[in-house]
């Protein structure tokens, strides 16, 4: 579990450093411009680290399931080799995910001077500002995202269904409280990350007001990561 915590914390730092330093530099210099290559780099890194975050949250849900439902077999099932392989598999999935999205952005054409109503280059806003037809991009992005993140969400839900049913059968109140507190902190992060993330990408093509999507983006790229250590320490 601590291996996943450490990697999740490192990934959270990477997500924050992808967006906040550039935003602060823009505020200090009063220059809101960003190069095309720099914008693509932000899209790539955000999608990559966001995908890794999703994979890690799903893996941690499975880890909690094994720890609570099969405590005597935990060290056998979640051995170091298996945990490392899960992390490598998560990074590999995230890499393929972000490469797909970057390739889909590269085939689009943009005007010479385009204003992004956001504090960083977010994929949904970039596609919305293209000068070419973006229907295929939206269709493929939503299809792939639903399949990619949907599998993680279903896995998390199934893990917690079995976990909660196992906790409710516990006779000791102390063990039940400890199990619920551990699961509750993880579920809080999951709800905050997926809720705001899906809100941004679903509402972006449907609304003309960027303010709401910017607030949601701050929640899943900054607030979730900064509050993660505090939530897990409760």
Swiss-Prot record:
One term of GO molecular function: G protein-coupled receptor activity
UniProtKB keywords: Cell membrane, Disulfide bond, G-protein coupled receptor, Membrane, Receptor, Transducer, Transmembrane, Transmembrane helix
Domain of life: Eukaryota
Coiled coil: none
Gene3D superfamilies hit by this protein: Rhodopsin 7-helix transmembrane proteins (1.20.1070.10)
Keyword Transmembrane helix among UniProt keywords: yes
InterPro entries linked: GPCR_Rhodpsn, GPCR_Rhodpsn_7TM, Olfact_rcpt
S-S bridge residues: 39-121
Function summary: Possible taste receptor.
Family: Belongs to the G-protein coupled receptor 1 family.
Name recorded for this polypeptide: Putative gustatory receptor clone PTE38
Higher taxonomy: Eukaryota, Metazoa, Chordata, Craniata, Vertebrata
């Amino acid at each position: 579990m601590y291996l996943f915590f450490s990697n999740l914390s490192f990934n959270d730092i990477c997500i924050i450093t992808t967006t906040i330093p550039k935003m602060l530099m823009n505020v200090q210099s009063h220059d809101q411009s960003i190069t095309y290559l720099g914008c693509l780099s932000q899209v790539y890194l955000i999608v990559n680290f966001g995908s890794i975050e999703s994979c890690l949250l799903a893996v941690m849900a499975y880890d909690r399931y094994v720890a609570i439902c099969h405590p005597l077999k935990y060290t056998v099932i979640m051995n170091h080799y298996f945990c490392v392989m899960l992390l490598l598999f998560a990074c590999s999935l995230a890499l393929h995910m972000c490469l797909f999205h970057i390739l889909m952005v590269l085939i689009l054409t943009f005007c010479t001077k385009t204003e992004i109503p956001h504090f960083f280059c977010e994929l949904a806003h970039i596609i919305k500002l293209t000068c070419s037809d973006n229907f295929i991009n939206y269709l493929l992005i939503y299809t792939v995202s639903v399949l990619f993140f949907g599998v993680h969400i279903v896995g998390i839900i199934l893990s917690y269904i079995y976990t909660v049913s196992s906790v409710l059968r516990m006779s000791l109140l102390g063990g039940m409280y400890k199990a619920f507190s551990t699961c509750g902190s993880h579920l809080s992060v999951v709800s905050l990350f997926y809720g705001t993330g899906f809100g941004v990408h679903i509402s972006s093509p449907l609304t003309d007001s960027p303010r709401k999507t910017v607030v949601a983006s701050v929640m899943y790229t900054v607030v979730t990561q900064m509050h993660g250590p505090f939530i897990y320490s409760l």
